């Protein structure tokens, strides 16, 4: 090992020099002040947790992105957080346990085993706001408006927002009656819009034809605002409850 190699950071791991650090700290304060003005309470989750707690309710992708290590005190497997969202959900459910809606925000470093792209970072600064205990259009709109104001504070221009309706997907999964493993596999194929793979899997699992047709249609329902009219027509058989 040369003297140069000794001081090289691992791939995807970055450090900020004074000018960059000062700029980022200014944005951090501005964003957290914004969240505070909206009634969001700051939490600081731990950087490391036991793996089973860290990955509760998460998918396989997060599992693969999580660094693991052994706790020298008891031999249990621990994980370095790759996403703070499950931690916020755990704090809301098991530490606070409020009946009224809870607004929480957070900012901290997360670590990924692999970068998103060929030259991407693995050590990222994540900021987020979560509204727990309220389901409906009002809470969706609040989070969306807060996100747009966050981007404005960070001076990010030319914003493009993709909107989806997760209730449609959940209802179709309920109709399909898939196992957890099958749901994860199908979700991965839907994310990649891999229609031939979706058709093959649904046929292999003997999913009812109406549900199969709608899951395939779901992979093609994207585009401008007129896609909503197509969705109402193609997914009409799902009934009420998703027509928001």
Predicted regions and their residues:
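Positively charged, Gly/Ser-enriched RNA/tRNA-binding surfaces
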Residues: 2, 13, 20-38, 49-52, ...
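Short active-site oxyanion
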Residues: 76-78, 155-160
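Charged, compositionally biased N-terminal leader segments and the immediate start
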Residues: 1-8, 173, 178, 185
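Short, conserved phosphate-binding/catalytic loop or strand-edge motifs used
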Residues: 123-127, 163-171
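Acidic, His- and aromatic-enriched active-site or binding-groove loops in soluble protein domains
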Residues: 64-73, 177-203, 207-208
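Polyanion/phosphate-binding surface patch
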Residues: 46-78, 120, 124
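Generic N-terminal amphipathic, Lys/Arg-enriched alpha-helix
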Residues: 7-17
């Amino acid at each position: 090992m040369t003297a140069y190699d000794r001081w090289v950071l691992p791939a995807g791991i970055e450090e900020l020099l004074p000018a960059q650090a000062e700029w980022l700290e200014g944005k951090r304060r501005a964003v957290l002040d914004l969240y505070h003005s909206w009634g969001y309470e700051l939490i600081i989750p731990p950087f490391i947790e036991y793996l089973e707690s860290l990955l509760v309710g998460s998918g396989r992708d997060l599992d693969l992105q999580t660094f693991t290590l052994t706790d020298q005190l008891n031999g249990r497997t621990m994980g370095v957080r790759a996403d703070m969202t499950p931690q916020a959900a755990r704090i809301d459910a098991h530490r606070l346990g409020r009946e009224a809606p809870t607004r929480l925000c957070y900012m901290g470093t997360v670590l990924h085993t692999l970068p998103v792209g060929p030259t991407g970072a693995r050590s990222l600064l994540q900021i987020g706001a979560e509204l727990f205990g309220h389901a409906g259009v009002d809470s969706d709109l609040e989070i969306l408006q807060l996100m747009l104001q966050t981007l404005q504070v960070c001076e990010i221009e030319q914003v493009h927002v993709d909107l989806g309706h997760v209730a449609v997907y959940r209802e179709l999964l309920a109709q399909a009656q898939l196992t957890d493993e099958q749901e994860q596999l199908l979700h991965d194929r839907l994310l990649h819009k891999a229609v031939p793979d979706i058709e093959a899997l649904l046929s292999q699992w003997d999913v009812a034809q109406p549900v199969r047709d709608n899951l395939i249609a779901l992979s093609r329902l994207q585009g401008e605002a007129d896609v909503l009219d197509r969705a109402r027509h193609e997914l009409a058989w799902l009934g009420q409850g998703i027509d928001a």
